[in-house]
Amino acid sequence: MLLVAFKDPRITRIAKVNLIGGQAKPGPQLASIGINMGEFTKQFNDQTKDKNGEVIPCIITAFKDKSFTFEIKTTPVTMLLKKAANIKVGAKNSKTETVATISREKALEIAKTKLVDTNANDEEAVLRMVAGSAKQMGIKIEGVDPVVHKDGKKK
């Protein structure tokens, strides 16, 4: 999408920003994109009011006439894992420290949420991606080994 969009001469900028759902405000992060910030924040907050307080990635396409389009992505895996594990930060040393454990069901729920934003074909593949992120944060997922591949071999 991004490469095709730059062929359109009306586009001035494509930016990826992380905003708080339902709480976006005009500011320097949006000013540099060159869009009508008031209109953008109104539309963004309306579309993300059900995700109030969550970090929401958003891809904004700005046009020469100050108009814009935007695409809302799903919340980052790290945020979803912290929420599921009920923690504020991950482990300082994830190789030796485990800060929380979550159930396979919670991890699968996160994988289903992220399935639309990945290039994976099935939930199990996304579950392994989620498990890898969890491992880096010091979060253990019951019954999931992030280093076992489909063929059963360990990395």
Curated annotation (Swiss-Prot):
Keyword Hydrolase (UniProt): no
Q: Name one Pfam family in it.
A: Ribosomal_L11_N
**Alphabetically, which GO biological process terms does the record hold?**
translation
InterPro entries according to UniProt: Ribosomal_uL11, Ribosomal_uL11_bac-typ, Ribosomal_uL11_C, Ribosomal_uL11_C_sf, Ribosomal_uL11_CS, Ribosomal_uL11_N, Ribosomal_uL11_N_sf
- Report the superkingdom from the record: Bacteria
| A GO-annotated cellular component | cytosolic large ribosomal subunit
Similarity comment: family membership: Belongs to the universal ribosomal protein uL11 family.
Outline the subunit composition. Answer: Part of the ribosomal stalk of the 50S ribosomal subunit. Interacts with L10 and the large rRNA to form the base of the stalk. L10 forms an elongated spine to which L12 dimers bind in a sequential fashion forming a multimeric L10(L12)X complex.
Protein name according to UniProt: Large ribosomal subunit protein uL11
Q: Which gene encodes it?
A: rplK
